[in-house]
């Protein structure tokens, strides 16, 4: 009859519902949206240039490289305790899909494309009334 019940969730929850036979993934938004700075870190330039800021950025960059280059099954095995209700094969599938979408690129700077896509989403949802310029918001680490 053209009606259904839909929810929006991030992985691995929808993949587990599908694996359990109680749901179906109708669409994945990530490939349609493309690069997006939705999950970003915020800090003041003074802190970023401090010893703590540089140490954090170095560790964060290593973590991103690890997520981008390590086999999904190895990551899933290490992260499994954080997802007690999720089957490890499902977690592996989800991590692999995120890797394929480029969710953890080695470059940690927010691209202008990703920033503008985020603003498009926020504007569509009427969460912002003004688009701040990329250069006014995004700080380039040197």
Predicted features by range, described:
Residues 1-83:
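Pocket-lining segment of extracytoplasmic ligand-binding domains
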Residues 37, 44, 100, 106, ...:
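Glycine-rich, flexible loop/turn motifs
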Residues 26-28, 41-44, 87-90, 111, ...:
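Alpha-helix initiation/capping motif
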Residues 49-128:
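Secondary-structure end/capping motifs
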Residues 24, 129-130:
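Residue-level detector of short coil/turn "hinge" positions at structural boundaries
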Residues 131-142:
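Hinge/cleft segment of the Venus flytrap/periplasmic-binding protein
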């Amino acid at each position: 009859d053209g009606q259904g019940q839909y929810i929006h969730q991030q992985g691995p929850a929808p993949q587990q519902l599908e694996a359990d036979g109680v749901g179906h993934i109708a669409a994945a938004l990530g490939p349609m949206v493309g690069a997006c700075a939705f999950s970003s870190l915020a800090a003041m330039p003074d802190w970023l240039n401090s010893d703590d800021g540089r140490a954090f950025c170095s560790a964060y960059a290593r973590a991103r490289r690890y997520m981008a280059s390590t086999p999904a099954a190895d990551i899933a095995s290490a992260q499994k305790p954080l997802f007690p209700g999720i089957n490890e094969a499902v977690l592996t599938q989800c991590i692999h899909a995120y890797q394929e979408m480029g969710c953890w690129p080695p470059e940690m700077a927010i691209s202008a494309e990703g920033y503008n896509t985020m603003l498009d989403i926020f504007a569509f949802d009427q969460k912002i009334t003004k688009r701040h310029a990329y250069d006014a918001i995004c700080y380039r680490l040197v």
